[in-house]
Amino acid sequence: LDEQKGALRWGNLMATLGWRQQVDSVRYGQANLFVTRYHMRASALSRNSYGEPNTSTYQASVSESVQSNNLLDVGLRGSLEHRWAAHRWQGGFSWTLHRYCLEATLSQSSNLSANLENPTQRSFSNQQLWTHEGVLYGEGDFRLSPTVRMSGGVRLALFLVEQKGYVGIEPRWAMMWQPFPGVHVQASYARQHQYSHLLSESYINLPTDTWVPSTARLRPMRSDQGTLSIGYEGVHGCHFSMEGYYKQMRNLLAYKDDFHVIGSFANWEEKLTVGKGQAYGVEWLARKEARRWSASLGYTLSWSDRQFAEIDNGRRFPSRYDNRHKVNLTFSQKLSQKVELTAAWTYSSGNHLTLSVENYEPANPVIPSRWQMDGYGRLDSWLPNTYEESLNAYGRRNNYQLPPYHRLDIGLTFYRPMTKGRMGIWQVGLYNAYCRMNPLFVIKDERRANCYPLVNTPGQSDVYRPVFKQVGIV
């Protein structure tokens, strides 16, 4: 008898206190004090039993695990903007205190058998880390001639963690040329450092990933991206553009192939390996704007891969989000001065995940521990057992691609003018309006790998369809 249950909760909270000041006709300043909090809590319960009760072969196990990830940011940022003629300059600063609750894990289990009197094991691990991030930046936008415009800037960042400091210099540059009226050609380059890493140990499209910071052992991620685009601003509100891009990434983090063997309560840094990646592609966009309606159609053809010395023998493999084709279609219609109808349809090639290509029966029927997938597509384990089970043999990393993902979102927006020039906005809508059963997880048996959407199994009292009502107030 096997029974598995899972639950997932996540959310964001944000509060901001702002100040704005018009210094004079050409200078403008602002400052903001902000607090943000992200939290995620995933729990899994597993019950397993084998053999006949009250016999020497009977075994039963109950295992429960809870994982949570929390990120708290408190910071201050300010900027000053100066405009003159056709030029603009802006400079500013920011300081942020980060608190990471890295892997708050609670695990408890019990075992029943003919030879044991219900032993219980409980474990708890909670790792916190505080970091500081300071930024100074300056940028300008200048018109060099009637047909040439250039913008550029530099961002200087300081990140302090575990008595170690990282300094990042991030130049940015872009130039636009208008050879003909309505036609522009643009090239750009940007370098970025990222001090927070998003680690993924599952393939499902839910926020089960973990935010971790750069540390004294793990350097910040660095990326360099270049783009080249051409656009056309046509008559009657028609716009067309095409852009090619290439992005190179260094100091990427990923879980090792055998990270689950290290144990749930080991230092999280020991489970990671450092590598590199690249992403490139071409994007097309067509947009039409009329007096009471607007529509846009976008298509992206892209590639993305990763390379780690300790994963897949150092060979390149497709990233989780190596979605070859993406289509976005949007439409909005003003029904009146106070009501607007919106619709958005999205299509994407499926994400990648790793599935075993072969299964073997073990030579020794005594298995030290059973490794399995929990309710969120992550590797998990439970108490030792003595039954025979097949072993998985994996090929390349991310060797399986899920079916395509698509959905339609529909919404209504109500505008209500208020006093002192303010505007109240109410929003209602449907997420996944035509109830597309997009794959959520995969269960593999001896013959095939089956994809399952976000729907409870038959026979349960409540059936959750992947259609959600949305209500918002701005």
What are these model-derived regions, one by one?
Residues 9-164, 238-241, 289, 296:
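Face-selective signature of the C-terminal outer-membrane beta-barrel domain
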Residues 9-13, 70-74, 130-134, 165-169, ...:
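Residues that define the transmembrane beta-barrel architecture of outer-membrane proteins
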Residues 21, 72, 78-84, 141-144, ...:
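Residue-level signature of outer-membrane beta-barrel architecture
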Residues 24-26, 84-87, 145-149, 178-182, ...:
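Outer-membrane beta-barrel channels and translocator barrels
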Residues 31-37, 91-97, 152-158, 187-191, ...:
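Transmembrane beta-barrel strands of outer-membrane/channel proteins
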Residues 177, 181-226, 246-269, 344-359, ...:
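Surface-exposed extracellular loop regions of Gram-negative outer-membrane beta-barrel proteins
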Residues 246-248, 266-357:
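Gram-negative outer-membrane beta-barrel transporters
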Residues 338, 347-388, 402-474:
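C-terminal beta-signal and adjacent terminal beta-strands/loops
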